[in-house]
């Protein structure tokens, strides 16, 4: 199976909320990379490494009762957080992937620990043309579902995804022509953003 990843080691320890902002920035760039290469993924993996200060600071050490591991230098640090989340089929939608990674971050990261390293991975990556399409075949019918409303909802979702794809392509074209900082999002200007 193929994957595309992005990792970052922070210059100083970050509180979890600031680290989440950095993870969101990394995810945004990773999704644009997927779109640029014409790829889609159906699973996201997140690994978050904690800082040594969590165990060297007596106040933080007293609050931490979890597993401990050694870093490459032989120092004790809290065990890294690692998890994955499956997406609803293969996609390169910024909205869907960003929501999934944010949910994953909230689920696996200890909110009391300082963060030092982060890795975001798009897993099971395929060319968009090779991605399995959603099953448009047989559907189990029942008397209580408004199928006209369901169909409208699916059409609206498809239109929203198409609009998002056009925005992604336009952003890529601008960044290629004028440089990677030609377009900034509000999250890129928040304190702690990289």
How does the language model describe each region?
Residues 1-194:
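Basic, low-complexity intrinsically disordered segments
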């Amino acid at each position: 199976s193929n994957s595309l990843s992005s990792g970052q080691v922070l210059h100083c320890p970050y509180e979890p909320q600031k680290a989440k902002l950095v993870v969101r920035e990394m995810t945004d760039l990773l999704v644009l990379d997927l779109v640029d290469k014409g790829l889609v993924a159906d699973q996201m993996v997140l690994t978050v490494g904690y800082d040594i200060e969590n165990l060297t600071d007596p106040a933080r050490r007293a609050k931490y009762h979890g597993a401990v591991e050694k870093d490459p230098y032989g120092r004790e640090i809290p065990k890294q957080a690692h998890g994955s989340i499956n997406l609803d089929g293969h996609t390169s939608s910024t909205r869907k992937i960003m929501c999934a990674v944010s949910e994953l971050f909230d689920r696996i990261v200890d909110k009391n620990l300082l963060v030092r390293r982060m890795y975001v991975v798009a897993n099971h990556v395929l060319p968009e043309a090779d991605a399995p399409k959603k099953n448009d075949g047989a559907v189990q019918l029942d008397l209580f579902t408004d199928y006209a409303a369901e169909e409208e909802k699916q059409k609206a979702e498809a239109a929203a995804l198409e609009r998002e794809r056009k925005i992604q392509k336009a952003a890529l074209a601008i960044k290629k022509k004028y440089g990677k900082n030609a377009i900034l999002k509000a999250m890129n200007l928040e304190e702690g953003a990289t």
